Amino acid sequence: MSNFNFDFAENDFGPLAAKMRPTSLEQYFGQSHLIGEGKPLRKAIQAGHIYSMIFWGPPGTGKTTLAEIIAQRINAEVERISAVTSGIKEIREAIDRAKQNRLADRKTILFVDEVHRFNKSQQDAFLPHIEDGTVIFIGATTENPSFELNNALLSRARVYVLKSLTTAEIEQVLQQAVEDPKRGLGKERLILEENLLQVLAEYVNGDARLALNCLELMVDMADETENGKKIDRTLLKEVLGERQARFDKQGDRFYDLISALHKSVRGSAPDAALYWYARILTAGGDPLYVARRLLAIASEDVGNADPRAMQVALAAWDCFSRVGAYEGERAIAQAIIYLSVAPKSNAVYTAFNTAKQQAKDLPDYDVPPHLRNAPTNLMKELGYGTEYRYAHDEPNAYAAGENYFPPELKDTQYYFPTNRGMEIQIKEKLERLREQDKSAVKKRYK
């Protein structure tokens, strides 16, 4: 068994972050949106009704700790697998132990750290054992599960998003570590400069583990004086080095930057869009994530006002893949500028959403006979394809008066092109075709 509940409180050699690891929900800092009083996950943990789940969040937000607390709460055996160092062999061994636990009427939590690093076949290896209840699967990932995990695995697990801890929460974690005489630094004679813990908490961007590691390093490096160990900002700067960008790929700051980029492009502000793109890159963001977002923008915010926008966005993505980051980042910048100055239309976005909603809400109307496929004589005898008008045989390849909706929806219109860009011509053409329909002698529906 690969149980990961170690009592570092009794081990002077354990790292501070491990010693201070919470063992109950009451000791746990952060994630009040998930485990605050009355929240569904907290109720499930307290009731012992645990199901498979994925914890998605930045480093140091308590994913592993929460899994440990859950395991302790339901008195389950824990099999821990790291996707960085494990493969199919380790997965099979863990499953075999879980099967033995099941024979002994013991639950097993299979905790998979960095689960996004497993490939499709490795992820698939968990499915039958989740399905038959051999294990309760808990995966931890710093990457977006929608992109990194198989749909089959996602459908069998509830995804919970863990947020970066706030500065105040990190400061509480640090204060507890300073004061706790058993697990923390309470026995040390520390002389802390005023507001030092707050400065450290602001630096680590919501990563509690990093905060505790930095605190421990400062204590180790501090000189012993007559009154104790003095820890000031000079020592803090020495430990921290150059301040890093306040950025977290999976946290709110990341999505705030992406949102700012998207809104700048939508608002036809190329300079602002370039600024936010540069901020994302400087902070370590993935340029290909931006490239994917540009494809969505090309469809959602430009649409048929400039159909070339999609081609430009796709070409930028392709360029990045072919030439690498240095040149590829500039190609993405070019696409950002193009999309920013392109005429804007959300007519496609609105039309598609309306069509999807009606398809969901309205009855499943039959396909009219003239639109049905008729590959066999029987189908032809049943009237399939009867009176279908082949557009290419009609004047200007348009069957005036024909209708391709069920009769119940004959006058429906989803797509309303704007008066911008290419949609000006599209709108004019559709208006001409509708006038032909109105004046047509041969109409499908009266």
From Swiss-Prot:
GO terms for molecular function: ATP binding; ATP hydrolysis activity; DNA binding; enzyme activator activity; single-stranded DNA helicase activity. Keywords: ATP-binding, DNA replication, Nucleotide-binding. It comes from the Bacteria. One of its GO terms (biological process) is DNA-templated DNA replication. The keyword Nucleotide-binding applies. The keyword Amino-acid biosynthesis does not apply. SMART domains: AAA (SM00382). ATP binds at G57, P58, P59, G60, T61, G62, K63, T64. Gene3D superfamilies: 1.10.8.60, 1.20.272.10, DNA polymerase III clamp loader subunits, C-terminal domain (1.10.3710.10), P-loop containing nucleotide triphosphate hydrolases (3.40.50.300). Coiled coil: none annotated. Belongs to the AAA ATPase family. RarA/MGS1/WRNIP1 subfamily. DNA-dependent ATPase that plays important roles in cellular responses to stalled DNA replication processes. This is Replication-associated recombination protein A. It comes from Haemophilus influenzae (strain ATCC 51907 / DSM 11121 / KW20 / Rd). The lineage of its organism: Bacteria, Pseudomonadati, Pseudomonadota, Gammaproteobacteria, Pasteurellales. The gene is rarA.
